[in-house]
Amino acid sequence: MNAISGGLNKVSFTNRKRIRKSFGRIPETTPMPNLIDVQRASYDAFLQMHVSPDSRTNSGLQEVFKSVFPIDDFAGRGRLEFVYYELEEPKYDVEECIQRGMTYAAPLKVVLRLIVWDVDEDTGARSIRDIKEQPVYMGDMPLMTDNGTFVVNGTERVIVSQMHRSPGVFFDHDKGKTHSSGKYLFAARVIPYRGSWLDFEFDAKDLIYVRIDRKRKLPVTTLLYALEGRATEALRAAREAKGESLEIGEIRGMDAEEILTYFYGKVPFTRTRTRDGETAWARPFEPETFRGAKLVEDLVDAETGEVVAKADDKLTARVARQIAVKTRTVLVSRADLIGRYVAEDLFDPNTGEIFADAGEEISEAKLKTFEDAGLDEIPTLAIDQAKGPWIRNTLAADKNASREDALIDIYRVIRPGEPPTSETAEALFRGLFFDAERYDLSAVGRVKMNMRLGLECEDTVRVLRKEDILRTIQIMCELKDGRGQVDDIDNLGNRRVRSVGELMENQYRIGLLRMERAIRERMGSVDIDGVMPHDLINAKPAAAAVREFFGSSQLSQFMDQTNPLSEVTHKRRLSALGPGGLTRERAGFEVRDVHPTHYGRICPIETPEGPNIGLINSLATFAKVNKYGFIETPYRLVKDGKVLDEYKYLSAMEEERLTVAQADAPKLADGTLTEDLVSVRRNGDFRLVKPDEVTAIDVSPRQLVSVAAALIPFLENDDANRALMGSNMQRQAVPLIKSDAPLVGTGMEAPVARDSGATIVARRAGVIDQIDGARIVVRATGEDGTTQGVDIYRLRKFMRSNQSTCINQRPLVRVGDRVGAGDIIADGPSTELGELALGRNVLCAFMPWNGYNFEDSILISERVAREDMFTSIHIEEFEVMARDTKLGQEEITRDIPNVGEEALRNLDEAGIVYIGAEVNPGDILVGKVTPKGESPMTPEEKLLRAIFGEKASDVRDTSLKLPPGVNGTVVDVRVFNRRGVDKDERALAIERAEIERLAKDRDDERAIQERAFLNRLREKLLGQVAGSGYKGVRSGTEITTELLAEIPRGAWRNLTVQDDRVMAEIETLKREFDASVHKLQQRFESKVEKLQRGDEMPPGVMKMVKVFIAVKRKLQPGDKMAGRHGNKGVVSKVVPIEDMPFLEDGTPVDVVLNPLGVPSRMNVGQILETHLGWACANLGRQIGEAVEAYQRDVAERERLHAMLKSVYGEEIYNEQIASMSDAELRELCGNIRKGVPIATPVFDGARITDIEDMLAKAGLDVSGQMTVCDGRTGEQFERKVTVGYMYMLKLGHMVDDKIHARSIGPYSLVTQQPLGGKAQFGGQRFGEMEVWALEAYGAAYTLQEMLTVKSDDVSGRTKVYEAIVREQDNFEAGVPESFNVLTKELKSLGLNVDLNLSVD
């Protein structure tokens, strides 16, 4: 239970610079959880890195070690125990790992204890001989970065959480599909977390069978016979109390009587005498049995002989209860006994002979035998129309009759072909479900089982119990009898999330189990007295399991780093695919569909289009994953029709008991629900109830959708399919050089920017001390304003993301600014003033324009391209390696054979391109030469070689050249050298620059610390009496400001004072300062040492150079653009500004969109956004004019304030704006003069009336339409046009990446046809259908060219080239190489094919 905090609306440093007006009516009272906590919390719980070893919980890595250790050797002489583990400091930090292509990981040291026993050969008693304890290195454990990612081999990866079916017991039926009669065949399945599956099922004859691990089925009673009987359980308990154990021979299974007693009650039939003196049979009267039955004959009270109900009467429940008050037993005819089943073995009281076994049917003959033997009571099974004979019939059909038979039968099914013995059968059966090492239900499975079966059992009991199996079969029989409900496997109560920590735990367990076998074998093969723990351990299997998981698991994915939203969404993704999950092909509609329990947990909108639809989902905004892996969503509690000030996170199972109202249910200020009937959700249905029946209410309207869907304004006005496209396309928006935050937002922009890690967030409150383009230095201050330390934030400048977009951070603060903890101090890619900014606000008109916006094409103004509104920077990385080859070392050099000076103009003396050089396709980036093979030399060459020495002819040019289609500016070069290899001048220059940067950081931090230390020292010294010890200050002198001013600041620390307490405080201060300076120096030296040490390289590589090139991409025809409502299109034409349609005041529009794209797509949200954006922009312009007037004339201040009050409303104005200083007000107005930013939260946004009010305030037509003139003629269009500001994005599908043309290029080796694809610089495929087209036109020569000289006629290609060189135009086509391939293949089949080209 959580109380609602009042601090949700704290105004941050950036919020004051640009205030976003919200149209939301429902106050946000519940804090939204951090968006990437799913990842971080899971991995922290797995590693427990910052928890001391003795207080770690038994989960995650700790549990893996505890479950595998201790390991005993086969002889019982040695045991290896796990004591604790610790993670040391990682060798490189995150940035270094990305640069060097390393994995960000920490060495894992495990302390193991080896115990050696002395074993007495006669008695077998053991005594400890030796105990050895030692830390053992167990490989590196990858660490998670602060942003929830892993750096593996230099690239950032994300482990996607997996949805899978929860362990536990599930009941289902075949929906009548199996049997021709259409009757339901019920089944139950016990799914463990680890171990054998257990399936129970009815067959068409209504017998119950069991399958173990989907093997051949057995009658369920075979399994029941194999379970221990009551007598054995009692015996086991008695033995365990004495500390003894049971022998295998003493174990007895359940017998038929015990099985039947568990599943059926007993109905005793007794012999009685009637009033007439005749003998008859009577049975107890139970209202439940007779309820709803139609009587065949009169119902007679056995004691009084009175008729209590007439024949042909139908007994209602009420009548049956009334009869039961007076009547205990009723008479029955002999015919009622015939066909019933005996409940227990019946003996002849005289001879002891068995008349009937338990479960046997009573026939006429049997009944006569019972009567003749004088049996006065026959116990029968309580089988009637309400309870079917399913177990009894199965028992009758089962050929086994004892535990031994049953165990052997089970053994034969599990291990067919192996000869069973009673010992192996017993061991196998025990290992299947009752051995904690092989079977694990997990805590979740046990909790789910308890809930479904109505049992109470600790969640530490992870194996199956006899009670679980019996209760499962009992519930299945009840389902068959028509009582209870089957389970819905798509309910989120039955599906759970496996996050990073759990996936990693399973993987590490696999690695440790591989190790365990090796350790056991090694313990047996060495002299155990003389070894230490590390001699027994080979950590490679564990390290390999981890490496394999991060490198190649389906759930370890290359992070989508296009923009901050795509990062956040990727980390919040839930996949039903992956190991142990579903496959695309097998997943049906039900599992992909939206389920009522998804509400507030999984987004119903955001999922991929295509084969993965519904299998990959996104967490909803407020959702969390609980300790059992179930997704929870928060609800505010409601009591007696009043909303309380507390909220609670609930899973789908817990929500079943609640009646939940919508967040927008009308209520008073104190939370009282006002409507007579409230619309609520209960058990997945919608209904209307009275307010006092409501038990909970949604915390926010946006808790239903994911982060990406919550960023779409007017989502409620868009069709779901288009909203899905809108959510997915926002993730593809490339960061622009200058992004705008949307004028029409939803209020989610700031949380996404903050939690994504794209921006820099202040860790502690403080004052900005220094700032430049690459770093921010904050002098941290405590709560009381005293200096606490220094925080240096390094900005990421022009770094390449996984998708080659540009990561660049810009400071938002100035020197002297005060910032609080959690404030955003630097913007990153696609953020502006701490808010997500994926695109630009552009002036759009919905109208046709000469057919250029046919089929969703987009027409843009030249101004958009010229002012770089949609220009993005992409950073391409190129690398070259100098290897040690058999012929000698490759060399990176400027001295390249047969290359002119012009081609080397961008290279320095080391042969590496300069930073800042403008490069074009074909330019050399890094010069490299490779030794050539020794070819036989002529005598002349030998002579020349002897005279002139080694020549350049020994090497060939293998330089790194810029590939076609790329041109840009070199922004960074990194040189890596193998350890022990001499560094070239360029590598040394880069190293020097890096050391200077580190030294500057160290010096600045030291200076701030020293300043703080001296200030605190000064406070301590002032007013004190000086002691002896400092030359120039007499003992007994009072220390004043003037005295301190005369002494150099550095010498203050040498002063002493007579007050011992103060002197002790000064000594402590000095010690703390010296320690922090020492730590600083150590950190600096370790970083420098790493820089100078040289790099770890792949085998055979001596040197590696990486060149990063920034490519500037302007918006051009062929680029894909989109809005946030699924309205996507391709730029068709860039029109000169003067030709664009313009408004009455002469403003040309930026973008023209097709109005036909709206009605059929049903995404009307884009129109509402356009109207509201138009109002925002015009209000901003008015505020801008008012600010200019105020700057000219101070008297205009009141008008400006009145305008701001009118726009933002009284509450925000009084809270935030009224108290602003002049400079703050000017900054605010400067930031909103392009448009007043507004938030229209999803499902709680601006109404039509709000939009009309805004348009009216801005002095615009409330229709939102304007008169527009044609830019070419200047004439007005005949009707008004919808014009306004829409937020447009440029998507990652750019024409530059796709367009491609080939002149000459590589050919396939066998077919000699050109390769395909842009990456191979391939040709265009001229396929079968294209051939048909040329055939249809009769273009014979063109067709011949296409199939021969332009494709795979090798000699013909050469002749064409020669003809072109000679400036001739005659050539002849030969035989295509593919024809030769065909003849060769026919020959390989033994068919000799000869091509006879002679002309008769």
Curated annotation (Swiss-Prot):
CDD domains referenced in this protein's UniProt entry, alphabetically: RNA_pol_B_RPB2 (cd00653)
EC code(s) of this entry: 2.7.7.6
Keyword Nucleotidyltransferase: yes
Cited InterPro entries: DNA-dir_RNA_pol_bsu_ext_1_sf, DNA-dir_RNA_pol_bsu_external_1, DNA-dir_RNA_pol_su2, DNA-dir_RNAP_su2_dom, DNA-dir_RNAP_su2_hyb_sf, RNA_pol_bsu_bac, RNA_pol_bsu_CS, RNA_pol_bsu_protrusion
Alphabetical list of Pfam families matching this protein: RNA_pol_Rpb2_1, RNA_pol_Rpb2_2, RNA_pol_Rpb2_3, RNA_pol_Rpb2_45, RNA_pol_Rpb2_6, RNA_pol_Rpb2_7
Spans through the membrane: none
Assembly and oligomerization: The RNAP catalytic core consists of 2 alpha, 1 beta, 1 beta' and 1 omega subunit. When a sigma factor is associated with the core the holoenzyme is formed, which can initiate transcription.
The name this protein goes by in its record: DNA-directed RNA polymerase subunit beta
Biological source species: Acidiphilium cryptum (strain JF-5)
Gene: rpoB
